[in-house]
Amino acid sequence: KKEIKAVSDKFNKPILFTEFGYRSVDFSGREPWKSDRYNTSANLIAQNNTTTALFETFWKEDWFSGGFIWKWFHNYETSGGELNNQFTPQNKPVEEIIKDYYLTY
């Protein structure tokens, strides 16, 4: 967090995460960019926890501008769901967490 704030201070610009999100798998916060764990069951609590941690860490900072959710699909009705272990928050409990933070801040 200190390093990110330092970049904001150095350039006198707010920080915007152009992409953020976590898979709904065990240890979703460990190397979250890796997507090679396809044969694992969904862990919706892990996705909730990692997403909440991101919001709690950055969302209230005045130097933070927000971010864009990875991975949001245009076909909402058929995307995600509680058995889906991929990045999308659609039709999963984490979607409500995201809505709450975007509404509040």
PLM region spans:
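Aromatic-rich peripheral "rim/lid" segments of glycoside hydrolase catalytic domains that contact
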Residues: 27-39, 44-53, 57-105
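Noncatalytic carbohydrate-binding groove/subsite architecture in carbohydrate-active enzymes
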Residues: 1-35
